[in-house]
Amino acid sequence: MYGQVQFGDSVIVGEQCVLGYPKEARLQEAQDGRHSTGDPVVIGERAMLFNQVVIHEGTVLGNECLVEDRARIGYGCEIGERTRVVHGAYICDRVRIGVDACVAGFICDATVIGDRSTVMGDLVHEYTRPDLGWWGADEAPPVIESDSVVGFGARVVGGVRIGPRSYIAAGAVVTRDVPAEHVVTGINIQTPINRWAGRRLSALIEHWTKPQATTARS
C-alpha cells in the first residue's frame, strides 16, 4: 500500500494488489526530493478486489464493488456501488462511473459512465494535438448516459455523448453524438430502437421501453 487506504467493513483484497499508487506528478516530485501525501483510496463496505489489482491515489470505490484480476484504476476516480470492473480493464484518471455498472476495455481520462451501463469496448480521446505533449492537451471525454451498452470491440472516439438506453454494437465506431434509444452499428450508422428489426436485442429493447411500475401513495 502507498499512502492512506480506508477500508469499509468486510472488504476482501486478493494477492499482489497495489493500492494508493501515486500519480505521475507526485513521483516526479519525489525524484526531485520533494515528498507529499496524496488523497486516500476509499474502499466501500463488502467490496472485493481480486488478484493483481492496481488502484491509484484518491480513488473511491462504492459499497459492494467488485474489481476482477489485473484491472487498473487511475487516480481520482469515483466508482459507484455494486459496479463490476472486469478483468484486465484499464480505467484512466478522474473517471466517474455510476451504480450497478459493468466496465471493461480501455476508459480514457475524465470519462463519465452512467448508472446501470455496460461498457465492454474502448472509450478514447481523439488525440488531435500530440504536438502539445502528453499532458498539454485537454480534450473532452466521452459520456455514456444511464442504461446504455457499448459492446465488445466497439470504440467511442472523442467528446461524444451516448444517450440513455442506447446500444453500441460489437465492433462499431462512434465519432458523433447518439440520441437516446438508438442502436449503432458499423461506423456511425444509427437506428432508433423502435425501428430496429433485429431479434437479438428484442428482449433488451422491451425491457427499456416497458412502462415502469409505480407505487400507489396512501
Say what each PLM segment does:
Residues 67-69, 161-185, 190:
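C-terminal/domain-terminus segments
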Residues 2-6, 10-159, 187-188, 195:
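Flexible, glycine/small-residue-enriched loop-and-beta-strand segment within the central core
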Residues 84-85, 184, 201-203:
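Glycine-rich, phosphate-binding/catalytic loops in enzymes
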Residues 116, 183, 198-200:
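Short, glycine/charged-enriched secondary-structure capping and boundary segments
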Residues 208-218:
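Intrinsically disordered, low-complexity terminal regions
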